[in-house]
């Protein structure tokens, strides 16, 4: 399929041919959901921790004698039922990451790209280059493209001026093509790809 190419100023710059195997799939929500869950689980810190009965700072002595008091039998005050005691089955430091096959991850990226094209939220620009690192000038360019919430994907190397100008714009993320991922694609409204990014993606999935 073919899609119009725009300049940063919003003018026409020809057409580009997109592979149906990457941009023409029927998006599957289950695959996208699995991928987002995998990304967020991998990102989660997992530093949560509570002290159990062997870790709390408290005497380990028996509270009172076993028999003769008429009260319930107890050992130390570290037990979970007492105030200041250890937590029973509390959270521990661990990794929340889980496995997801590499083929499923690759498929999810293609489905995310297809979903953006199907929703008419994909914009192809000829190049992501700024003459100077001025946020105001880049905001004007984005306004001409109708961008207020977007993920912008450039080639393997980002233009320094463009990167600096864009990093102060709210709700706009800029990544090189090797950093493209399903979660960032879905969390932003529009997806902007440079022609270099399209070529790199088609080479990657060849």
Swiss-Prot record:
* Keywords for this protein: Ribonucleoprotein, Ribosomal protein, RNA-binding, rRNA-binding
Residue numbers spanned by region Disordered: 42-93
Q: Name one GO molecular function term.
A: structural constituent of ribosome
- Composition bias, kind Basic residues: at what positions? 64-77
Under the heading InterPro entries, the entry gives: Ribosomal_uL4, Ribosomal_uL4-like, Ribosomal_uL4_dom_sf
Question: Example GO biological process term?
Answer: translation
Q: Name one GO cellular component term.
A: ribonucleoprotein complex
Q: Work out whether the entry's keyword set contains Signal.
A: no
Q: How does it assemble?
A: Part of the 50S ribosomal subunit.
Report the PANTHER family cross-referenced here: 50S RIBOSOMAL PROTEIN L4, LARGE RIBOSOMAL SUBUNIT PROTEIN UL4M
Give the protein's biological function. Answer: One of the primary rRNA binding proteins, this protein initially binds near the 5'-end of the 23S rRNA. It is important during the early stages of 50S assembly. It makes multiple contacts with different domains of the 23S rRNA in the assembled 50S subunit and ribosome.
Question: Which family is it part of?
Answer: Belongs to the universal ribosomal protein uL4 family.
Protein name per UniProt: Large ribosomal subunit protein uL4
Species, as recorded: Agrobacterium fabrum (strain C58 / ATCC 33970)
Lineage of the species this protein comes from:
Bacteria, Pseudomonadati, Pseudomonadota, Alphaproteobacteria, Hyphomicrobiales
Gene it is expressed from: rplD
């Amino acid at each position: 399929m073919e899609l119009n190419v725009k300049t940063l100023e919003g003018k026409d710059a020809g057409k580009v041919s997109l592979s149906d195997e990457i941009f023409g799939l029927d998006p599957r929500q289950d695959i996208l959901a699995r991928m987002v869950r995998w990304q967020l689980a991998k990102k989660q810190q997992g530093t949560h921790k509570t002290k159990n009965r062997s870790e709390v700072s408290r005497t380990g002595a028996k509270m009172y004698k076993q028999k003769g008091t008429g009260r319930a039998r107890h050992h130390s005050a570290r037990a979970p039922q007492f105030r200041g005691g250890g937590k029973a089955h509390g959270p521990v430091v661990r990794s929340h990451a889980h496995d997801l096959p590499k083929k499923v991850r690759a498929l999810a990226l293609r489905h995310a790209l297809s979903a953006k094209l199907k929703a008419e939220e994909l914009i192809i620009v000829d190049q992501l280059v700024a003459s100077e690192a001025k946020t105001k000038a880049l905001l004007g360019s984005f306004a001409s493209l109708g961008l207020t919430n977007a993920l912008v994907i450039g080639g393997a190397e980002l233009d320094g001026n463009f990167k600096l100008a864009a990093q102060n714009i709210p709700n706009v993320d800029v990544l090189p093509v090797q950093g493209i991922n399903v979660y960032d694609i879905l969390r932003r409204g529009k997806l902007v790809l440079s022609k270099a990014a399209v070529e790199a993606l088609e080479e990657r999935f060849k």
